[in-house]
């Protein structure tokens, strides 16, 4: 993470945001998951340093859409939907195997997952959050993500969305008292 923050080899992707979500709800503010991801874009990311946004949602998106977006390069991924220890369940339902085959070398996003158990490391050789952190290309160069925030347990629907909203507000310096200049500061 320190090398990535101090000496990034690729930077064009950092202004791209990706939202992956179900179309289920209601959750935060009575919104469905995809509407909530659109809110994160319109309320925070679009007025910060992010220039483009792609939403990959149930009903209009696919696994290949999500993989293509990640491989092309994104700086942040907000996922809101069902998940488990080995993958996401909605929008672009990536699995551990999909993450281990990504080709986004040196274009590593930070990921906020609102879903059950993606970080359940204690019962799996490689849980979904870990797969993002450990992924490499054929030459051993990092792929996957620079950081992934995800639950280790089954969780309720709406309260974690409040956390995702708050993390995006901190990342985009929307509250003066919560300014962070590094991934570690988030």
Predicted regions and their residues:
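Cysteine-dependent hydrolase recognition
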Residues: 1-186
């Amino acid at each position: 993470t320190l090398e990535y923050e101090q000496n990034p080899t690729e930077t064009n992707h950092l202004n791209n945001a990706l939202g992956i979500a179900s179309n289920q709800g209601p959750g935060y503010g009575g919104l469905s998951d995809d509407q909530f991801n659109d809110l994160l874009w319109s309320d925070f990311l679009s007025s910060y340093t992010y220039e483009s946004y792609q939403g990959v949602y149930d009903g209009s998106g696919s696994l290949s859409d999500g993989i293509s977006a990640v491989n092309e390069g994104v700086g942040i991924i907000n996922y809101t939907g069902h998940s488990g220890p080995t993958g996401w369940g909605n929008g672009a339902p990536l699995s551990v195997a999909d993450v281990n085959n990504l080709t986004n070398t040196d274009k590593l996003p930070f990921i906020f997952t609102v879903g059950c158990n993606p970080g359940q490391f204690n019962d799996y050789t490689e849980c979904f959050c870990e797969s993002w952190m450990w992924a490499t290309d054929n030459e051993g160069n990092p792929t996957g993500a620079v950081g992934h925030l995800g639950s280790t347990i089954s969780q309720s629907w709406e309260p974690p969305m409040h956390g995702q909203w708050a993390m995006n507000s901190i990342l985009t310096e929307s509250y003066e008292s919560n300014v962070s200049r590094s991934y570690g500061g988030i």
